[in-house]
């Protein structure tokens, strides 16, 4: 069991199943079980995934001043997250609408409200940092002070870059330069994947880079073992909704990497973990325990054969 501090964006999500992306205009569409509303966002999804895997998690985020925190722990879910460090200090909780179709294409509409103006109370964070094994951050403004805490306490820092864009790269340099592990999603990157990973590795010198590629799998770079490898996605369930798959993959990778220091084994486990996740509606559903994941692994593969 590892101890994580996870800080970043949490939002309320409305997920809508549509016939195809891009959508065609129709004045009315009625379809049963096609709209799902829940809590989501990088920090929430990653915290929940790590908790399912058996880790200790300090979940740190900001929400609207009138938000009902019970939305983070619905009664029918076995695993709960502490909301002790969920601070209601912004006017409204960020919102997202996600449209998706059967081909795994998706279209997002995001409204981060006034989260860019939030200031997290770091006095709550400081006593917890020495006890954690890793800090996991979103590249949002209120997470910037967390970087120095990780560096000063010699803690591993993992950062999921939310919607990477070249014209915004300069604003993310403090995250990029200090992270031991970086995660990008290719849905906002219009560059040759291997060249992008190579450039990020040379420019920022992280230990690990993961480039999530959706239905095409992932590319992983490991500085210490000197390789850059593509892994295909794993298909174990019918795809219901691929939203949150990147969060699931990232969290599971971090869980196993801290445990084993083996990036190949960790990405292998993470791809399997994500494949189960996308068989469920909602970004925060479909997670497995470590025991369940190992059982799936033994049924599907010989783990040594994946290295």
Give the ranges of each region predicted by the language model.
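Alpha-helical transmembrane segments within multi-pass membrane transporters and channels
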Residues: 62-64
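Short, basic and Ser/Thr-rich N-terminal targeting/leader segments
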Residues: 53, 91-94
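Ribokinase/PfkB-type carbohydrate-kinase core domain
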Residues: 2-12, 75-87, 99-229, 261, ...
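Residues at secondary-structure transition points
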Residues: 34-41, 92, 240, 244, ...
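Conserved phosphate-binding/catalytic region of the ribokinase-like
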Residues: 4, 197-307
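Glycine-rich phosphate/adenosyl-contacting loop at the front of the ribokinase-like
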Residues: 1-60, 69-70, 281, 307
């Amino acid at each position: 069991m590892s101890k994580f501090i996870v800080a970043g964006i949490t939002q309320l999500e409305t997920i809508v199943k549509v016939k195809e992306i891009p959508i065609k205009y129709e004045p009315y569409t009625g379809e049963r079980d096609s709209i799902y509303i829940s809590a989501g966002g990088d920090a929430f999804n990653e915290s929940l995934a790590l908790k399912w895997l058996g880790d200790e998690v300090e979940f740190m985020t900001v929400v609207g001043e009138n938000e009902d925190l019970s939305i983070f722990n619905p009664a029918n879910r076995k695993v709960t997250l502490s909301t002790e460090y969920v601070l209601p200090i912004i006017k409204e909780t960020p919102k997202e609408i996600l449209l998706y179709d059967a081909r795994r294409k998706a279209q997002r509409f995001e409204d981060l409200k006034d989260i860019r103006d939030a200031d997290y109370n770091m006095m709550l964070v400081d006593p917890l940092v020495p006890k954690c094994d890793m800090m996991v951050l979103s590249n949002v403004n209120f997470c910037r002070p967390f970087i120095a805490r990780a560096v000063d306490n010699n803690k591993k820092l993992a950062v999921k870059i939310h919607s990477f864009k070249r014209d915004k790269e300069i604003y993310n340099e403090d995250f990029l330069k200090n992270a031991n592990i970086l995660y990008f999603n290719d849905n906002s990157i219009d560059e040759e994947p291997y060249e992008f990973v190579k450039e990020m590795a040379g420019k920022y010198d992280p230990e690990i880079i993961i480039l999530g590629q959706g239905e095409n799998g992932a590319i992983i770079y490991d500085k210490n073992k000197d390789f850059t490898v593509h892994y295909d996605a794993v298909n174990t369930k019918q795809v219901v909704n691929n939203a949150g798959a990147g969060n699931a993959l990232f969290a599971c990778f971090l869980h196993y990497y801290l445990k084993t220091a083996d990036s190949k084994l960790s990405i292998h486990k993470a791809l399997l973990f994500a494949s189960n996740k996308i068989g469920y509606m909602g970004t925060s559903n479909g997670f497995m325990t470590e025991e369940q994941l190992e059982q799936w692994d033994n049924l599907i593969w010989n783990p040594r054969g994946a290295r």
